[in-house]
Amino acid sequence: MSLLPVMVIFGLSFPPIFLELLISLALFFVVRRILQPTGIYEFVWHPALFNTALYCCLFYLTSRLFS
């Protein structure tokens, strides 16, 4: 028996962190959509690495908000 509550959606069980991952993913798409027209990606050396770091920061902020 697990100590953490499990979300069950249509018979599929998800860990409690799943909601935080989805919220941070939605925030990531919004922030990326805002940053692309500003031209910030022209100053970034590696856009994929920047996107990964941005998602990690947003996930950290989201998880701190929920805890």
Swiss-Prot record:
Cross-referenced Pfam families: DUF1656 (PF07869)
Subcellular location: Cell membrane
Source superkingdom: Bacteria
Transmembrane intervals: 3-23, 39-59
Database matches in InterPro entries: DUF1656 (IPR012451)
Membrane protein topology class: Multi-pass membrane protein
GO CC term (a single one): plasma membrane
Keywords attached to this entry: Cell membrane, Membrane, Transmembrane, Transmembrane helix
Family of the protein in this entry: Belongs to the AaeX family.
Protein name (database record): Protein AaeX
Organism (species): Yersinia pestis
Lineage of the organism: Bacteria, Pseudomonadati, Pseudomonadota, Gammaproteobacteria, Enterobacterales
Gene: aaeX
